[in-house]
A protein has these predicted regions:
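A structural signal for multi-pass alpha-helical bundles of membrane permease subunits
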Residues: 1-221
C-alpha cells in the first residue's frame, strides 16, 4: 500500500509543481534563463547524492532543519524525522519531490512552447479569461506530453531505490519500505526466495507500466 501511496503522491506533486513552474517560465520574465538554470540544479545532482545530503539536513540531532527550528522564537521542539509519525513518510516524499520537479518542468515547458500563440490571442478576443484559456487551450494542448511524463514518472518513482534507502532505509520497522527496498532488505537477510519473488512482482508491474506507456505514446497513435 505504501508503495502505491509513495508513487501517486510523488508523481502528483511532481506534475503540479512542474506545471506551475513551466507556466511561469513560459512568460517573458526578466532573468528567466538564470531562474531556469537554478531550477535544474536538483535534476543535475545524482539522486543518491541528493538523498544523502537531505538525510543530513533532516538528522534529528545535528540536522540543519532542526537547528533552524530550535533557533526560532517560540516553543519549537526538535522533530524526530526518522521515527515520528507522519514525518518518516513525509520526509522522503519531500526529498523526491525536490529532485523530480525539474524533469516535469522541462518536459511541460517544451509542451507549452509548442502550443500556437494565436489560439490564446483568439481566446482573448472572444473575452476568455486567463483561467478559462488555461483549461480550454493549455491543458488540452499538454495532453500528450502530460500522459507521457506522468507514466514515466510512475515508472521511475515506483522503482526508485536511492531516496528511500539513503534517507529512512525503510524504517522505522520497515514502514517506509517500498517494494524495491524491501526486496533488497530481504536479500541482505539471506531470504533469497522471497527476494526473487519480489523481484518478479516488481518486474511484472514495470512491464505493465511499460506497455501502457508504449500504447499511449505519440508514436503508437
Amino acid at each position: 500500500v505504501w508503495t502505491i501511496i509513495w508513487t501517486v503522491v510523488n508523481v502528483f506533486f511532481h506534475y503540479v509543481f512542474g506545471l506551475l513552474l513551466a507556466v511561469v517560465l513560459n512568460q517573458r520574465l526578466k532573468g528567466r534563463t538564470g531562474f531556469r538554470l537554478m531550477l535544474l540544479v536538483p535534476w543535475a545532482i545524482p539522486i543518491y547524492i541528493s538523498a544523502i545530503g537531505w538525510s543530513f539536513i533532516f538528522n534529528g540531532e545535528y540536522g540543519l532543519l532542526n537547528n533552524i527550528l530550535a533557533a526560532l522564537p517560540g516553543d519549537f521542539s526538535r522533530v524526530a524525522w526518522y521515527s515520528e509519525f507522519p514525518w518518516y513518510y513525509v520526509m522522503p516524499i519531500i526529498v523526491n519531490v525536490w529532485a523530480g520537479i525539474p524533469f516535469m518542468m522541462v518536459a511541460l515547458l517544451g509542451g507549452l512552447q509548442g502550443i500556437p500563440q494565436d489560439q490564446y490571442e483568439a481566446a482573448k478576443v472572444d473575452g476568455a479569461s486567463r483561467w478559462q484559456s488555461f483549461w480550454a487551450i493549455t491543458m488540452p494542448g499538454l495532453r500528450t506530453v502530460s500522459t507521457t511524463v506522468i507514466l514515466l514518472g510512475c515508472i521511475w518513482t515506483f522503482n526508485l531505490f536511492a531516496v528511500i534507502w539513503f534517507t529512512t532505509r525503510g524504517g522505522p520497522a520497515g514502514k517506509t519500505n517500498i517494494l524495491v527496498t524491501y526486496a533488497f532488505d530481504v536479500f541482505n537477510q539471506g531470504e533469497l526466495a522471497l527476494a526473487a519473488t519480489y523481484g518478479v512482482i516488481i518486474f511484472s508491474i514495470l512491464i505493465v507500466f511499460s506497455l501502457v506507456y508504449r500504447r499511449m505514446s505519440p508514436e503508437s497513435q
